[in-house]
């Protein structure tokens, strides 16, 4: 038992001391040059266990430092998609670096500095690759899309969240849609391709994010 505890402690220390180093290969990536905040989403394996974590990192005096303790997270039911391989409906979370611009939720306002959009009953996110509004937020009376996702759900998974700017500019048909950071269904749940965490942690993230610091999310940074 003591040996196991020591190994767990060592693993935790290693994660703390190397997490910022994982940003180094992305230092010149588009979107990273002006970023002052990063959400680093990783998978971590120890013995026979694999978990996913979100590390909130902030740049201080040109150095990346952890802004908060790492948070438990869940991802797509089929894991991460390597860069460029995400496809509509594949159940995978896209790997890569993406901007964070707009928060959303059910209440009229949220405790965040980010631009915020209240989601109403008729708000839809189009996931029909053949529709001209693919991967766009639109009102129900403005679309004839064959497939879409209601943004005000009965299960409260979108009670609070933030849009991950994946495949949004430009939008490419079939490469995936509706990728968000949102509230999870539980620690043992999965998503259709989003990143999710507890409501408490999502609120912490929303309260921390600062649009003046050009926040981004880096998903699965160890994927070449």
Residue ranges and their predicted role:
Residues 11-12:
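C-terminal motif of bacterial Sec signal peptides marking the signal peptidase cleavage site
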Residues 16-191, 202-224:
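Cell wall/extracellular polymer interaction/catalysis modules
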Residues 198:
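Conserved "landmark" site that anchors the functional core of diverse proteins
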Residues 1-4:
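Sec-dependent signal peptide recognition
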């Amino acid at each position: 038992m003591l040996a196991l505890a020591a190994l767990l402690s060592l693993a935790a220390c290693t994660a703390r001391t190397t997490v910022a180093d994982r940003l180094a290969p992305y230092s010149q990536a588009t979107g990273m040059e002006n970023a002052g905040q990063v959400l680093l989403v990783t998978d971590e394996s120890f013995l026979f266990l694999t978990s996913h974590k979100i590390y909130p990192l902030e740049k201080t005096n040109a150095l990346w430092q952890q802004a908060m303790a790492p948070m438990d997270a869940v991802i797509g039911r089929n894991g991460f998609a390597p860069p460029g391989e995400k496809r509509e409906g594949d159940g995978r979370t896209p790997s890569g670096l993406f901007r964070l611009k707009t928060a959303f939720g059910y209440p009229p306002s949220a405790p965040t500095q980010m631009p915020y959009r209240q989601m109403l009953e008729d708000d839809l996110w189009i996931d029909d690759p053949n529709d001209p509004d693919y991967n766009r937020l639109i009102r129900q009376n403005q679309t004839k899309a064959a497939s879409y996702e209601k943004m005000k759900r009965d299960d409260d998974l979108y009670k609070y969240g933030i849009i991950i700017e994946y495949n949004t500019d430009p939008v490419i048909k079939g490469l995936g849609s509706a990728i968000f950071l949102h509230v999870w269904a539980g620690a043992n749940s999965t998503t259709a391709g989003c990143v999710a965490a507890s409501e408490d942690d999502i609120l912490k993230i929303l309260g921390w994010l600062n649009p003046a610091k050009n926040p981004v999310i880096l998903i699965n940074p160890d994927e070449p």
